[in-house]
Amino acid sequence: TDHAGFELKEFIKSHLNVLNYEVEDCGALEMDPLDDYPDFIIPAARKVASNPNSKGIIMGGSGQGEAIAANRIKGARAVVYYDGPMEIVKLSRMHNNANILSFGSRFITHEKAAEAVDLWLNEPFEGGRHKQRIDKLDN
């Protein structure tokens, strides 16, 4: 995240640590109102794309630019979630095998983001016809 999502990132990081998840923080490591999200999102997306068993959580003011940046990396499949039906979070994993979840910190509460993270991290990918579609994206 950049400065816009810094507080939410710290909250989610703490939430995941309590649940004993291994968390690698790609930044920002301190609040800097002049930082730029690509400096943090691109390295995070590269890490996720290089390890098929990893997942990433990114955020910014809207989450949109962050998802666009992440999706520039081959193998990264970032989706944006706002405070909407949780079924969207489930489907992003079940059908799209999303490996990066992006939040707009200006549009979601910390608690709702944590709820979405918990669901998203535990939702399996269905594979089958959905895998065939995703494979076409990476060719």
Model-derived features with residue positions:
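Mid-chain, well-packed structural core segment of small domains
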Residues: 59-106
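Short, structured active-site "lid" loops
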Residues: 39-58
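Glycine-rich phosphate/diphosphate-binding loop of Rossmann-like nucleotide-binding domains
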Residues: 1-22
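C-terminal binding/interaction regions
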Residues: 1-7, 86-139
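Short, conserved beta-strand edge motifs with alternating hydrophobic and charged residues
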Residues: 24-27, 56-60
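Short amphipathic alpha-helical segments
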Residues: 10-13, 68-72, 114
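A short beta-strand-loop structural module common to alpha/beta enzyme folds
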Residues: 22-34
